[in-house]
Design a protein with these regions (language model features):
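Activation segment
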Residues: 53-57
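Conserved C-terminal C-lobe helix
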Residues: 83-97
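Conserved activation segment of eukaryotic-like protein kinases, specifically the C-terminal portion
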Residues: 36-49
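Short, conserved alpha-helix in the C-lobe of eukaryotic-like protein kinase catalytic domains
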Residues: 65-74
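Conserved HRD-motif arginine in the catalytic loop of eukaryotic-like protein kinases
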Residues: 102
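Catalytic-loop of the protein kinase fold
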Residues: 1-12
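Conserved catalytic-loop aspartate of Hanks-type protein kinases
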Residues: 61
Length: 113
């Protein structure tokens, strides 16, 4: 999992492909084997579990993607301005405080989009 998805870490290549950079906070996720020992991520994009509330997992990146999608649509963090229309329900689910209530995989988020 990346654990630091934010606009500064998303680049677009010359051929139009989206690339994630800066993997300093990332780790390989193995269910029930990993234990977070440090707070990592960027304020505003980090999921609540990154502040020690729970262990991070792939849903942590889904939270950050929800924030990123909202910023792309509104220019604002979802805590300030939530996008309207069809994307509102998607973003609200992606940035849910409870990881169990978020999309459970990037595939699930992609299908909703």
């Amino acid at each position: 999992i990346h654990r630091d998805i934010k606009p500064d870490n998303v680049m677009i290549s010359d051929d139009g492909q989206v690339k994630l950079i800066d993997f300093n906070a990332s780790r390989i996720y193995k269910k029930d084997e990993n234990k977070d020992t440090r707070i990592l991520g960027t304020t505003g994009y980090a999921a609540p579990e990154q502040y020690g509330l729970n262990q991070t997992d792939p849903r942590t990146d889904i939270y950050a993607l929800g924030v990123l999608i909202n910023i792309m649509l509104t220019g604002e963090h979802p805590s300030k301005v939530m996008c309207k229309g069809k994307f509102r329900k998607i973003v609200k689910k992606a940035v849910n405080i409870n990881p169990d209530d978020r999309y459970q995989s990037c595939q699930e988020l992609m299908e909703a989009l």
